[in-house]
Amino acid sequence: MNTEKPSVAHNVDHNEIAKFEAVASRWWDLEGEFKPLHRINPLRLGYITERSGGLFGKKVLDVGCGGGILAESMAREGATVTGLDMGFEPLQVAKLHALESGIEVEYVQETVEEHAAKHAQQYDVVTCMEMLEHVPDPQSVVHACAQLVKPGGEVFFSTLNRNGKSWLMAVVGAEYILRMVPKGTHDVKKFIKPAELLSWVDETVLKEQHITGLHYNPITNTFKLGPGVDVNYMLHTRAKKA
């Protein structure tokens, strides 16, 4: 059995990239495939902003930025934002939308490992939202994010827990019953238990600050943050000061 990890320059699942490339043109359609991302973005932004003590004047990196939903919203808060993604089409959509919106965001097509090799300790805040479950080596991504943040800076991760409930909610429910996201968006085998993510964090300069769940109520069709990390969750970490 081949146990070699992908090289840092190729920590990419091309099937995952292809899935998002295929629907990239509809990234900013509020009623399209990315409607859930638009719906949860105010919650993500609020969490990041509050726990970072505000984003104004800060240098921010959004890892796995896709079409730029979170990146643009952080730029609107006054941050200097760089968006990183390996999908060409999503980045083209992001660049065009930023231009049309009058928002300045720098978008770069490269892996986070490649970016870390050139920009170590250059960011006040690093975000990595709904990206870890789409790469072959999420541990490598966590390590790279830790390298990119300044001492004392903030790093945020969000992903999906791996258990029966998350499979029912995120795959069966969201993809096949409610059709909130396209079928095949998620692979439960790639979901990440909080203990696994925290073990990778502990290998770096990062320290856990707070963890919260992201919950969907199908009856009220609303999202909220709160206790319980059995499906979607967000983790706030902080780099040790020099």
From Swiss-Prot:
One GO molecular-function entry: 3-demethylubiquinol 3-O-methyltransferase activity
One of the GO biological process terms: methylation
Binding residues for S-adenosyl-L-methionine: R44, G64, D85, M129
Reaction equations catalysed: a 3-demethylubiquinol + S-adenosyl-L-methionine = a ubiquinol + S-adenosyl-L-homocysteine + H(+); a 3-(all-trans-polyprenyl)benzene-1,2-diol + S-adenosyl-L-methionine = a 2-methoxy-6-(all-trans-polyprenyl)phenol + S-adenosyl-L-homocysteine + H(+)
EC primary class: transferase
Highest taxon, organism lineage: Bacteria
Metabolic or biological pathway, per its Swiss-Prot or TrEMBL entry: Cofactor biosynthesis; ubiquinone biosynthesis
Pfam family, one: Methyltransf_23
EC annotation from Swiss-Prot or TrEMBL: 2.1.1.222, 2.1.1.64
UniProt keywords, alphabetically: Methyltransferase, S-adenosyl-L-methionine, Transferase, Ubiquinone biosynthesis
Keyword Signal: no
NCBIfam families per the UniProt record, alphabetical: UbiG
Similarity section: Belongs to the methyltransferase superfamily. UbiG/COQ3 family.
HAMAP family: UbiG
Role noted for this protein: O-methyltransferase that catalyzes the 2 O-methylation steps in the ubiquinone biosynthetic pathway.
Designated name of the protein: Ubiquinone biosynthesis O-methyltransferase
Organism whose genome encodes this protein: Salmonella typhimurium (strain LT2 / SGSC1412 / ATCC 700720)
Organism taxonomic ancestry: Bacteria, Pseudomonadati, Pseudomonadota, Gammaproteobacteria, Enterobacterales
